[in-house]
Amino acid sequence: MKVGWKTVMKQQKLVKKMTIEEKAAILSGKTVWQTREIDRLSMRSIFLSDGPHGIRKQAGSGDHLGLNASLNATCFPTAATIANSWNQDLGEEIGQALGEEAASMDVNILLGPGLNIKRSPLCGRNFEYFSEDPYLSGKMAASYIRGIQSKGV
């Protein structure tokens, strides 16, 4: 998703209007997964969700451990499994499905996919990464992101 220069300038002007307290408030969050709104500037709250393999959203606000029940969502294969196909169209289809689910749950930002090369077998997040091959990782991540963004997320 490309952001034009006018949008950047508008955002910079908005940040300049914010007090230090308002800036701190949006960084600290309203809930574990939600930013605070700033009514004075008509800034709405933004909902973020973890989930490169499926949307993770709780019915209520989660506690600091995230122990509330999650809403039902599709669980897709790991990025490594998808990358084994070398099929960018498949990556984009999965991204579209994730984007549709995110939009249906009022999720504004999906925190994924993870893009990193697998440098060590000891990395506990390797399942989130597509491949140790930077070319394949980049192509698959781009297709995934195109799919997600095509649904407005």
How would you describe each model-predicted region?
Residues 2-153:
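N-terminal beta-rich core of secreted/periplasmic extracellular enzymes
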